[in-house]
């Protein structure tokens, strides 16, 4: 993957904590130990696909960014592309947001959509959506790292 290659070139570390044979709390404890060792300002959950406990979310409040593969608030939770395909939507999108205790409901940092139509298969729709996810996540991370996001009353203000 080109992301892995760029990551190595930039000396960005990553870690893998398998979750099989661990309770959710045990898994999060291992992840928290790794996070705390690095003390990051921002934590990106890309393809994490696990619901976090409230304790974990509270511990890293304001630092967790998630990319969700739908144009929120539509199609919260798992399998949004399947849901979108079944509903016959005319646009699909992605949303980068801060993580809160409520699933996929945190303050929105960035969003984008692309048009789709009846000729798209479910697989084509998902592939097109993944491309949107990449660009939305990159934009959101850039905005956060450039300190251009202000959160107020559960909403974000993006400074240009």
Label each residue range with its predicted role.
Residues 7, 37-39, 59:
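Alpha-helix C-terminal capping/helix-to-coil transition sites in glycosyltransferase folds
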Residues 13-40:
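Adenosine-nucleotide cofactor-binding segment
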Residues 1-8, 12:
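Single conserved hydrophobic/aromatic residue that forms the stacking wall/gate
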Residues 23, 27, 42-160:
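Donor/substrate-binding cores of folate-linked one-carbon enzymes
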């Amino acid at each position: 993957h080109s992301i892995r290659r760029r990551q190595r070139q930039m000396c960005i570390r990553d870690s893998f904590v398998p979750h099989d044979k661990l309770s959710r709390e045990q898994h999060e404890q291992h992840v928290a130990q790794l996070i705390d060792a690095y003390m990051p300002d921002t934590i990106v959950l890309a393809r994490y696909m696990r619901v976090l406990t409230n304790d974990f979310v509270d511990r890293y409040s304001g630092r967790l960014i998630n990319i969700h593969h739908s144009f929120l608030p539509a199609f919260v939770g798992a399998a949004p592309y399947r849901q979108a395909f079944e509903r016959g939507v005319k646009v699909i999108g992605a949303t980068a947001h801060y993580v809160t205790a409520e699933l996929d409901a945190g303050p929105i940092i960035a969003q984008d959509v692309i048009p789709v139509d009846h000729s798209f298969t479910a697989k084509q729709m998902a592939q097109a959506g993944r491309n949107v996810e990449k660009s939305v996540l990159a934009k959101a991370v850039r905005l956060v790292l450039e300190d251009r996001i202000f959160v107020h009353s559960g909403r974000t203000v993006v400074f240009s």
